[in-house]
Structure formats: structure tokens, C-alpha cells
Amino acid sequence: MLSSRAAAFTGRRLASTLPPVPRKKSHGVRRLLAKAVVATSLFYAGGLTLSAYNDKANELFVEHVPFGEELVERWEDWTSLRRPGRRMIDARRVDEISRDFRAAATPEATPVVVRPLVQLQLPELQMQGSSPVLEALVNNVNDVVVALNARALELPEDTASALSSVYGEIVHSIQALNASLDQEFATEVESRTGKAISSVQEQLEVEYKQRELALAEQYIQNFEVFKSQLQKATAEQLETELKAHEQALLARHRNEVAQLSIRQVEEFNKIIEKKLDQERNGRLAKLSELNSAVESLAPVLDRLELRAVKNECVTQLSTLISDIQGKLSRGGDEPLDLSSDLQRLTLLADILPRPKRCCSEGPALLDVAMAELQAKAQAPVASNEQLYNRWQLLQPELKTTSLLPPNAGFLGHLTAKLFSMLLFTKEGFSTTQDMDAVTARIAENLRLNKLDCALEEAVNMKGWSRKSADAWVDLARRRLEVLTLLDVIEAEVKTL
């Protein structure tokens, strides 16, 4: 047991007095973790050794230290595997000692050495400015120390001194670890701070250069924009001033020209007045008599002009009326539109000078005839050929209507239609008053262009025959009225 304790203490001292690993300037976090692992291993090794020789320490280590129970169990299993050889050696020594005791007649009493016991009091670990990892380790160590001091363990003096020395070495190692960590942390902070400062300086220099380039480019752009705007504004202002100056010069030139022309006119008037004054008593002495003679000729010239205008209007009116009558006499297969001719006729009638009315207050015959002609010629006027053709188409119906009895019904109409087919169509002039003779006379008058006689015969018809011929009578009456009005206007124009 003593040899195993000595071996354990020796291993712990060797483990606690191992030289520190030389530091490297790089990998500070790795060194920090390695030192934390070493300190934790030393702490667990010391606690495991103490728990192997003291039950109270064993109980505190198992209850308060994480993974303490598992480590103690593994330690006991490992020691149990090493003990069988020693048990055999101890059994042999016990047999030898028992044989020696039996051989001795009177056994000698071995003195019992009583070693004084000392109460174990370990100081708490004080650490300031440690890292969070070491601070947790220090807190765990202080918890174990407080628990050991609370148990008031009484140990032999050499054991207590050995534990105190081991604890002191652990404290020294933790403090050295803390100091090295602080130094490495300061070194690492300084190196990283230098790197950060250098990188920040480089970044600031790059940003400064970029900002300087951007500002220079922006300044150039703003300068170019300002330059273009200034050039544009200057050009516009210069153009405006040039235009204003040009306008002022033109106005001044016009004023000077106007003044010069006024002076020239005044001088010319003076010259004319002077010449007139000179000639007034000479060749222009009878100028007033000449003026009165010219004034006496003015009414004669007006009358001549009025007569010429009247003759021209009468000539054009006669020509236009002759043209309209020629159109109506020529005829054709389509109705005649006289609107344009009537507009010209009305215009000439308005221009025509006429004598003043002295006896009658009513409108002149020419105006009445023109108004009636405008009213009658609004619709197209049928030609003589159209009237003749329409009358030829109307004759069979007139034959049928002439055979109808009074109040004829359907049978009467049918009978009249059949008998009308048996009648012979008369031609030429006939003196009888039957329907065939009347239609023959009307057709002959139309053929001979005697529209008034034909219309008179048609108007004198009675009954269904007159009713059937109403449309033809209207067309013939419109043509006859237009021709009559043209004759009236022509006669009135000839009397002017």
C-alpha cells in the first residue's frame, strides 16, 4: 500500500512538475485548450489520488466533481487487476511471519508507533482576470476545497503535508497557466489588433482611393455638366442679346428710313406746291373749269355703265333662258335637273338694273316669275319623250277604266279587263268623245309637242280614268308651268 501511494505521489509530482510546452506564436487557441486540458487532467489526477486514500475525500470527489464516480470506478477496477500478484507475495510473507511466531517460544512484543493526526485545511484558490475556462476550473477546485475543509479531515502529518504540497503545485500550475494564458491572450490580442489595424488601414486606404477616384470622377462629371449648362446658357443669352440688338438696329433703321421718307415727302410736297403755284397762273389757270366739266360728265358715264350692265345682264338672261328651253326641248330618257341653271338665272336677275316702280307697290312680275320658277323646279322636270312614253304605258289602263260600270266589283274589273283587250287602239285626231279618241288625241298632241292641248284633254277626263292619270297630269303640269314661266321671264326681260 505504501509503495503504491509513493508511486501515486511520485506520478502526481512528475505530472505536476512537467515542464511547460514551449509556446508558439501561432495557434494561440490550441495552446489555450491544451493547457486547459492539462490543468483539468492534473486536477482529476490529484482528486483521484486523494480519494484513493481517504473515504471522505472519495465521497466529496464522487458527489461534486463531474465524471468523478466513473473515474473512481475505473481506478478501482485497474488496481484490482494489479493486486493478485501482490496478494500472493503478502500471503507468503504472512506464512513466514506465522512460522517465525510459532517457532519462537516467547514472542517479542513489537512497539506500535502512533503518528500524530493533523486536520486538513486547504486554502481556496484566488484567481483574478482569468479566462472563462480557467474560471470554471477554479470554481470547481474551490468547491472541492470548501467541501474538504467542511469535512475537517484528520490525516497523518506526512500525508497532509504531501496533499498540501500537491495542492500547492496544482495552484501554482493553474496560476502559471493563467499567467501564460493572459500573456498569450495579450500577445494574440496585440497581434490580431495589429493585423486588424493594418487591414483596416489598408481597407481605409483602398476606400479612400476609391472615394477619391469617385469624387474626382463625380467632380469631372459635375464640371462637364456645369460647363455644358454654362455654355448653353451663355449661347442662349448671347443669341437673345444678338436678336435684341438686331431688333433694335432694325427698328432704328426703320425709324431712320421713315424719317428720311417723311422728310423727302415733305420736300416733294414743297416742290409740288411750288410748281403748282408757278403753273396756277399759266397752263393750269382753267383747271377749275376742267374739273366742273369732268364732274358734269360723271352722271353720263354712270348712266352708260348702268346701260352696259343692263344690256349684258339682258343678253346673258336671254341666252340662259334659251339654253334652258333648249334642254327642255331636247329631252331624253332621264328627268332634267335645272338647279344650277336656276341659281345662275336668279343671280343675273338680282344684278339686273331695273327702273324704279312708281305706280305699283307690289313686287315686279320678273320677281314673281323667278320665285314661282324656283318653287316648281325644285324637283327634276320630265322631258316630252318621258311624258309620251308614260302616256303610252297608261293607255291600256285607261281603256280598262273606261269600260268599268259604276260601283264595279271584282267581276266588273275582270270583265272590263277582258273587253279592253278586244278594243282597237285609235290613232290621230278624232272628233268623238269616247276614251279611245281622247287618248289618241292626247298622244298625237304629245307627238306634235303640243303639251298644253294634251294636258287640257287629260284634265277634262272624269271618273276612274282621271284618277288613273293623276300622276301623269302632275308631271305634265310641272313641265308646262316651267315652260310658261320661262316664256314669261323671257318676255319680261325683253321689255326692260
UniProtKB/Swiss-Prot annotation:
What is a single Pfam family found in this protein's UniProt entry?
A: Mitofilin
Q: What is its main location?
A: mitochondrion
Q: Which InterPro entries match?
A: MIC60
**Gene Ontology, cellular component aspect:** MICOS complex; mitochondrial crista; mitochondrial crista junction
Regions crossing the membrane: 36-53
Compartments, as annotated in UniProt: Mitochondrion inner membrane
Q: Which residues lie on this side of the membrane: Mitochondrial matrix?
A: 15-35
Tell me a GO biological process for this protein. Answer: cristae formation
Which UniProt keywords are listed?
Coiled coil, Membrane, Mitochondrion, Mitochondrion inner membrane, Transit peptide, Transmembrane, Transmembrane helix
Transit peptide located at: 1-14
The topology of this chain with respect to the membrane is: Single-pass membrane protein
Mitochondrial intermembrane topological domain ranges are 54-496
Coiled-coil intervals: 216-261
Record function comment: Component of the MICOS complex, a large protein complex of the mitochondrial inner membrane that plays crucial roles in the maintenance of crista junctions, inner membrane architecture, and formation of contact sites to the outer membrane. Plays a role in keeping cristae membranes connected to the inner boundary membrane. Also promotes protein import via the mitochondrial intermembrane space assembly (MIA) pathway.
Whom does it interact with, and what assembly results?
Component of the mitochondrial contact site and cristae organizing system (MICOS) complex.
Would you identify the family this protein belongs to, as annotated? Answer: Belongs to the MICOS complex subunit Mic60 family.
What name does the UniProt record give this protein? MICOS complex subunit MIC60
